[in-house]
């Protein structure tokens, strides 16, 4: 998966680039698939990870919230004679599709997929004009709904927190003024306004609309909430010795994964001022280095790998802890809800 909403995946000749699984060797090393093991791939996409896991002899349960990914994956299902189950589902609900404490591994590749970015009609990229949609599935509010109906204060919160956009107030007020005249309908429409009110400077490496598009996509698909719930579900479904491997592409996602593994490493409750009443048993221990990033060679061959970070944990035999969303400290932006209505 990738995060750059500018999209534009082309090779040197200008043609489309085939989907290349990011950090594939590192994922396999951390996941350790083998015959007799059951691995859940929570983000099937184009099937890159699933194919490699199957090639190692393991069985795979694969999930994807995008109906087009499920349709495209049917040929792979047919080719693997009962060793691959492909299910249309969000990875936050992975516990509904796997035996409790029965998985040997879970792999999550967070963010929008290359295929989604490369399809203008999905509305993820501003490089080609398409409907302002950004939904990974066909349900829920679209990016156009948010841009055209959300209160200015809510737009500012979304752009600032989910996009880390310093110009959030200026952009939000410009959106409000423009939508009174005409609603936003296309990706180019919104990107053009953002570029007008926050023009690109010579030192800027990204398009002025990049962070706003990222924020809208994350909000529309509740990506941070989905990730947090998937981590809790993986904790419940992995057997002792099972492996959780997560690949992220921007700092907000990585912060959640890092916080989860740090919290689940086990420590005494309390502080030096208030002695702990008991030790918390670790539910995960680290696998290898705390964080792995792409090699320079991979980043050169696949620029989308440059921002990727991998974190992995080994499940202990301690009981799973409560799923407490307050652990991550981010506001419940999904509750903004009424979009000004």
Swiss-Prot record:
GO terms of molecular function: rRNA (cytosine-N4-)-methyltransferase activity
Family matches, as SUPFAM superfamilies: Putative methyltransferase TM0872, insert domain (SSF81799), S-adenosyl-L-methionine-dependent methyltransferases (SSF53335)
Binding-site list for S-adenosyl-L-methionine: 47-49, 64, 91, 109, 116
Catalysis performed (reactions): cytidine(1402) in 16S rRNA + S-adenosyl-L-methionine = N(4)-methylcytidine(1402) in 16S rRNA + S-adenosyl-L-homocysteine + H(+)
Residue stretches spanning the membrane: none
Superkingdom per UniProt: Bacteria
Record-stated family: Belongs to the methyltransferase superfamily. RsmH family.
Name recorded for this polypeptide: Ribosomal RNA small subunit methyltransferase H
Gene name of the record: rsmH
């Amino acid at each position: 998966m990738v995060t750059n909403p500018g999209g534009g995946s082309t090779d040197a000749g200008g043609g489309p680039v085939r989907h290349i699984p990011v950090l594939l060797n590192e994922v396999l090393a951390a996941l350790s698939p083998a015959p007799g093991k059951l691995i859940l791939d929570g983000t099937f996409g184009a099937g890159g990870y699933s194919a490699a896991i199957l090639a190692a002899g393991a069985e795979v349960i694969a999930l994807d919230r995008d109906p087009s990914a499920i349709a495209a994956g049917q040929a792979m299902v047919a080719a693997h004679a009962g060793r691959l189950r492909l299910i249309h589902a969000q990875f936050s609900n992975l516990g509904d599709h796997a035996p409790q404490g029965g998985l040997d591994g879970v792999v999550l590749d967070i963010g929008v997929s290359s295929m989604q970015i490369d399809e203008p009609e999905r509305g993820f990229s501003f490089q080609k004009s398409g409907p302002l949609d950004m939904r990974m599935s066909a349900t829920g509010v679209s990016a156009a709904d948010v841009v055209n109906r959300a209160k200015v204060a809510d737009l500012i919160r979304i752009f600032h927190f989910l996009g880390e956009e310093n110009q959030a107030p200026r952009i939000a007020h410009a959106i409000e003024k423009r939508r009174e005249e005409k609603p936003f309908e296309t990706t180019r429409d919104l990107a053009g306004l953002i570029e007008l009110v926050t023009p690109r400077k010579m030192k800027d490496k990204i398009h002025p609309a990049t962070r706003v598009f990222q924020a809208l996509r994350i909000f529309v698909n509740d990506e941070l909430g989905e990730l947090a719930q998937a981590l809790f579900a993986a904790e419940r479904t992995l057997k002792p010795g099972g492996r959780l491997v997560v690949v992220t592409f921007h700092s907000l996602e990585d912060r959640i994964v890092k916080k989860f593994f740090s919290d689940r490493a086990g420590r005494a409750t309390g502080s030096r001022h208030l002695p702990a009443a008991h030790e918390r048993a670790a539910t995960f221990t680290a696998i290898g280095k705390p964080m792995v990033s792409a090699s320079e060679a991979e980043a050169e061959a696949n620029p989308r790998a440059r921002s990727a970070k991998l974190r992995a944990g080994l499940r202990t035999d301690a009981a799973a802890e409560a799923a407490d969303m307050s652990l991550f400290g981010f506001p419940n932006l999904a509750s903004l809800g009424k979009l000004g209505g």
